[in-house]
Structures are given as structure tokens and as C-alpha cells.
């Protein structure tokens, strides 16, 4: 059985890769009164008086929203939000297994930047962080920029920053192994999308100077050779 078929059968068996589990068993009437009404009113009052207490009195301190519009899912492309759900669930499972961070998959059925930004902003007070995932360029740049301005919690675009961090780490270690200097390397970035641009920005900030970036038309020699929507980035 190949890996695709094996994965499909596993997904049929599991009916999803994540679940919500109560951190306190509700076994008695007092448990119910403490975790829900009437006792829960007091934490609500405290948060109403001091917004920051929402990070102390709720699980918000450890909740991350993993959000996509389904337009750039893995190597599959624009397959829609529902079809992107298995990937979002998988990312949430990684958060939990490797960092003990509770993450929720959220798939937004819109390609409109304003709608996506407003939707995420309106639910942001339920979370401690936002992880943008598999949103096509150049729309992803604008969404991230605006959310960072609006939200009071960290906003991270995995396809940009996660990829850039991994590439930078690999190059640093490669330099250690080969004894070469960071600024002496000649680097080719094959692709000028979300990941490629983010990689270029990070490497330049770290002192890597000799960088050649290519897109579907070949080597990019000036801004004229970059597609109009991507130029500002």
C-alpha cells in the first residue's frame, strides 16, 4: 500500500486528528458550579475589569488559531478551505505533540483580503497567537501586515517565516561544517512567492549578500521583472 492510500485509510478511521478534552473532570455538582455557572461569573468579572487577565484565567495563554483560505495548500494549490482542513488539523497536531500548544484549525471561505482580515481580527480575542497557513501570495503579505497592525497577539505566517527560519538555520550550519563565511556564499532562491521573498529578506538581514532570486520567468534583475502585486514586498 502506498503512503497516500495508507494516509487516506487512517483519516477514515480517525475522523479527524485532534479533539477538545476538558482539563478538569466534572464529576460533582460543585465541579459544575465552579467550572460553569454560577462560579464562572467571577473570572468573567475579573477579565471585564482587566483584559490581560484573559491570559491568566482562561486557556487563551496556550491557544493558537491555525488559519487558511485554502488557496495555496501544500503542492495542491487552490483547493478550497474545506479541502485544506486535513493540513490544518495536521499542523494543530504538530503544535500539540511537539510543543504542547493547543491549536484550532480555522478554514475561511473567502479570498477577499478585507473579509479574511476582519474575520481573524474578530475572533482574535479567543487566542494567544495567530498562525496563517497556506494563503496564496501576494494576498498573504497584505493579510499578515494588516493583522499585525490590528491584533495585540503575535501573528505568524508559517509559509513565510517558518520556511525562512529553517533555510537560515541550514545555511548557518552549512557554513560551520564547510568553514565558509556567511557573507561569502552565493545563494540562489528559486521562487519569488511568499517563501522565497521571506527567505530573501531574512538572509539579507543576517548579512548574506550575494543572493540571486528567480521566478517562473528566470533571474529577477529589477522590480520590473517582478509581478505587479508582489513588487512592494
Language-model segments: residues:
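N-terminal ligand-binding/catalytic initiation module
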Residues: 1-155
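A glycine-rich, Thr/Ser-enriched phosphate-binding loop motif common to dinucleotide/cofactor-binding enzymes
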Residues: 157-173
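Conserved S-adenosyl-L-methionine
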Residues: 205-209
Amino acid at each position: 500500500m502506498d503512503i497516500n492510500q495508507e494516509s487516506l485509510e487512517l483519516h477514515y478511521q480517525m475522523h479527524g486528528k485532534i479533539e477538545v478534552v476538558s482539563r478538569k473532570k466534572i464529576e460533582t455538582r460543585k465541579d459544575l458550579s465552579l467550572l460553569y455557572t454560577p462560579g464562572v461569573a467571577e473570572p468573567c468579572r475579573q477579565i471585564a475589569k482587566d483584559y490581560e487577565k484573559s491570559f491568566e484565567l482562561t486557556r487563551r495563554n496556550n491557544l493558537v488559531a491555525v488559519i487558511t483560505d485554502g488557496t495555496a495548500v501544500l503542492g495542491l494549490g487552490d483547493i478550497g478551505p474545506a479541502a485544506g482542513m486535513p493540513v490544518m488539523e495536521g499542523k494543530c497536531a504538530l503544535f500539540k505533540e511537539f510543543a504542547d500548544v493547543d491549536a484550532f484549525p480555522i478554514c475561511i471561505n473567502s479570498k477577499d483580503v478585507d473579509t479574511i482580515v476582519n474575520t481573524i481580527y474578530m475572533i482574535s480575542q479567543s487566542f494567544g497567537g495567530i498562525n496563517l497557513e497556506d494563503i496564496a501570495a501576494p494576498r498573504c503579505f497584505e493579510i499578515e501586515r494588516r493583522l499585525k497592525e490590528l491584533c495585540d497577539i503575535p501573528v505568524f505566517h508559517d509559509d513565510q517565516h517558518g520556511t525562512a527560519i529553517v533555510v537560515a538555520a541550514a545555511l548557518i550550519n552549512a557554513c560551520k561544517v564547510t568553514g565558509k563565511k556567511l557573507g561569502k556564499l552565493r545563494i540562489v532562491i528559486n521562487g519569488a512567492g511568499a517563501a522565497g521573498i521571506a527567505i530573501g529578506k531574512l538572509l539579507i538581514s543576517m548579512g548574506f549578500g550575494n543572493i540571486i532570486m528567480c521566478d517562473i520567468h528566470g533571474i529577477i534583475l529589477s522590480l520590473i521583472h517582478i509581478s505587479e502585486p508582489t513588487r512592494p514586498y
